[in-house]
Amino acid sequence: MENNTMEKQFIESLKPTQADPSARTYKVPTAEIDYTNYLPTKWGVEYVQLSDEADELEACLLKGMNYLIEGDKGLGKTQLVHNLCFKHKLPIVPINCSEGTKIGDLIGRPQINEFGSYFQLGVLPTAIEVANKSEHKIAVLYMDEFNAMRHEIQKATNSVTDDRRSIVANGTTYQLNEGVRLAVVATINPSTYAGVNTLTEDAKSRFVGATWEYPSSEDMER
């Protein structure tokens, strides 16, 4: 409850005053990013692709494209993304999306600790900064179960997934540096799943992707 109240107060502080419409007051410093949190690690066994879905995903990652995967749970989507990042030494910023995902999770929110107040960046500006610091000038933002988020929360990703490749957080514009790429990979569950929302038209227009299916008995016998 305290965090929600503080977040509302912080948002109110960002609104311009009537006397000066351009005025903005930002009251807290932004916490530093620990880039070691986003180093890739290898997950489990190797993914066995059915056709060319893994190759297609890999190509999109290396080009810094937005890629959308629709498929049931348990197909190995998350494992494959992490293992491809490990293979190519690409830092990865993950988020498990849900109905409860808030704007603060994506953009950031004010926090308090024993040293005072600070602004904790969300995954969107964090992913941009991680990409800018990456040795290979590329990073991956992995948004699992993207369509579990409400429409207004989905829309908060628009400026990162379109040509702007930027986001404003705590009064600072976080922008990909020239030559730096950010691959945004999102997974969605089929519409038959509970707690699933439709994708906004904005999201549909910003991703390429494919539908993945469970292997058939014939596939398992290969």
Label for each model-derived stretch:
Residues 2-222:
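AAA+ P-loop NTPase catalytic core and its hallmark functional loops
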